[in-house]
């Protein structure tokens, strides 16, 4: 499974301001629900924040992958967000998150989310990919860049 096949340019947000983690997540989820009417903002916020309280999804190399299984949706939605100044996500390396990949899966997906997480992590273990992506501002260009590097 390729990340580029799951991305929608309407759910890619660049040049985002640096905010506190919960406020940032609320803002992104609000934007997603504006674009996708099947996304119930309050439900998604509750589930994502509950997941973050269990264990931060901040990884290393400026990446965070918040994710949850969402009732009432029938397909996976992925939002890719870039904040060049970063957000403190409690990442394992102590660095601020600059690239956030928010994954919303239907409840009945089995291990589908694990395939997506594997695809995301294999792409973003390449430091040059991260550095180059931080300079791309156009959502379609981001999708094309990801396709070229998968």
Segments from the language model and where they lie:
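Cytosolic covalent-transfer regions centered on His/Cys nucleophiles
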Residues: 1-150
């Amino acid at each position: 499974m390729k990340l580029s096949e799951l991305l929608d340019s309407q759910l890619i947000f660049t040049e985002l301001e640096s905010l506190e983690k919960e406020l940032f997540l609320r803002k992104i989820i609000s934007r997603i629900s504006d674009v996708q009417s099947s996304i119930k903002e309050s439900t998604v916020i509750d589930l994502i924040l509950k997941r973050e309280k269990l264990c931060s999804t901040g990884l290393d190399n400026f990446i965070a992958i918040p994710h949850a299984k969402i009732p009432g949706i029938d397909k996976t939605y992925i939002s890719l967000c870039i904040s060049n100044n970063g957000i403190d996500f409690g990442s394992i390396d102590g660095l601020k998150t600059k690239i956030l990949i928010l994954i919303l899966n239907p409840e009945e997906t089995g291990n589908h989310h694990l395939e997506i997480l594997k695809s995301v992590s294999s792409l973003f273990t390449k430091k040059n990919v991260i550095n180059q992506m931080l300079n791309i501002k156009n959502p379609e260009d981001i999708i094309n860049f990801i396709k070229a590097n998968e």
